[in-house]
């Protein structure tokens, strides 16, 4: 016969072998439960374990009148009224543990309702409409972006805008509205495009002027060895041909030309 290792069977077997004296709580509980008389003013022996093979009875759900007296009204409404609502107990669990019900508190519907009202006034709950919950997965998508979205122009729109810019760099408001309506754009988009295009045009103009000035400075200018410009180069050559000969060269030529007798 296989041996059973269930905790309930072992606990119930020990409870049946060793009967507890009357007026004492049961020997063991499946979970740590405070004595029932501390919450409802019942005697310690009010709750007891049933026979083997049955589940244990919760000590908070059975009253002394149901066990040892005539049937009366159910204790579940009293149990619900003795504690604060579920929402407040869920939100203030640590506070609920600290302020437990004392053994000497009077029981009854009026006392329980007064205790619940006092608890709610002592610990007011915030308005749940003030909170805005955002899921973790979609937090990056739902947050507002500070950057402005760039407009993706089509090739046809860019061609028409460039053509209009070549004819007129500054548009009037009426012309801007006409272009925006024709290209299926907003007036603000057309205005921003023309502003950016003018800035780009100015940058391109400054760059071309700078490159042109640097090329003229490097390639232009007359050579330092020549004292005359290119326009008077012919005059300079004529002046060089008419320069007088030096005295030494003239005397040498005279000596060579003398004839001996």
Curated annotation (Swiss-Prot):
Chain intervals with Low complexity compositional bias: 226-235
GO cellular component term of the entry, any: nucleus
GO molecular function: DNA-binding transcription activator activity, RNA polymerase II-specific; RNA polymerase II cis-regulatory region sequence-specific DNA binding; sequence-specific DNA binding
Composition bias, Gly residues: 210-223
Keyword annotations of the record: Activator, Developmental protein, DNA-binding, Homeobox, Nucleus, Transcription, Transcription regulation
Biased composition, class Basic and acidic residues, residue ranges: 251-261
GO biological process terms, semicolon-separated: adenohypophysis development; hypothalamus development; neuron fate commitment; positive regulation of transcription by RNA polymerase II; spinal cord association neuron differentiation; transcription by RNA polymerase II
Record's subcellular location: Nucleus
Region ranges (SNAG domain): 1-20
Region ranges (Disordered): 201-261
Residue ranges flagged as DNA-binding region: 146-205
UniProt xrefs under InterPro entries: GSH1/2, HD, HD_metazoa, Homeobox_CS, Homeodomain-like_sf
PROSITE patterns named in the record: HOMEOBOX_1, HOMEOBOX_2
Residues annotated as signal peptide: none
TM stretches of this protein: none
Entry similarity comment: Belongs to the Antp homeobox family.
PANTHER family assigned: GS HOMEOBOX 1, GS HOMEOBOX 2
Known role: Probable transcription factor that binds to the DNA sequence 5'-GC[TA][AC]ATTA[GA]-3'. Activates the transcription of the GHRH gene. Plays an important role in pituitary development.
Name of this protein: GS homeobox 1
Organism encoding this protein: Mus musculus (Mouse)
Gene designation per UniProt: Gsx1
